[in-house]
Regions:
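A short, N-terminal "cap"/entry segment at the start of jelly-roll beta-barrel domains
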Residues: 1-49, 81, 139-149
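Double-stranded beta-helix
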Residues: 106-149
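Structural motif
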Residues: 75, 100, 108-110
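Conserved short histidine dyad/triad with adjacent acidic residue
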Residues: 46-64
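Glycine- and acidic-residue-biased ligand/ion/polar-headgroup-sensing regions
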Residues: 63-82
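Short histidine-centered beta-strand/loop micro-motifs
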Residues: 58-63, 80, 103-104
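Short acidic-glycine-tyrosine-enriched beta hairpin
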Residues: 80-101
Length: 149
């Protein structure tokens, strides 16, 4: 769990997120949800499919739980506090609890994340609350309590 507290990577990602919000063509997170995401549900599972146009840079939320990632199309640069890599479709991997990603689409990219959804929640705002935290202080509290999965 100590590796989760990588302050250099955290500060880079937060700084990028802050700068992106000031750009004239910046898309607010809530609007991006409407434009670029599809949501799929199966018993006990939630899948989010995101379409990311070439040249778009996105900083995501902090995920509380480990989850599956699938790049089905394209090539994308991904930076987290755990590592930095370029992924080319087809690519499948598992994200660690506590992951916050900054991504840059090198080509048009389609990305799916698959999350446990044991209560079969279908309300997207409720799922966001279940699966993510809004800041690193909240994440650190979960780490200290041993509540990351």
């Amino acid at each position: 769990v100590a590796k989760l507290k990588n302050d250099i990577a955290r500060n880079f990602i937060l700084g990028l997120e802050s700068k992106l919000k000031t750009l004239p063509k910046s898309i607010p997170a809530d609007k991006m949800q409407e434009i670029y995401n599809d949501h799929l549900f199966a018993p006990g599972l939630y899948c989010r499919q995101m379409r990311i146009p070439q040249g778009m840079c996105i900083v995501g939320k902090i995920h509380k739980h480990s989850h599956i990632n699938v790049i089905t199309k394209g090539e994308i640069k991904v930076v987290t506090e755990f590592d930095s890599d370029t992924y080319t479709a087809p690519k499948i991997w598992i994200s660690e609890p506590g992951t916050k990603r900054a991504v840059y689409a090198l080509t048009d990219t389609e990305w799916m994340t698959v999350h446990a959804n044991p209560d079969n929640i279908t309300d997207i705002d409720s799922l966001v609350d279940l699966l993510t935290v809004s800041n690193y202080d909240s994440l650190d509290l979960l780490i200290d309590k041993g509540e990351l999965q």
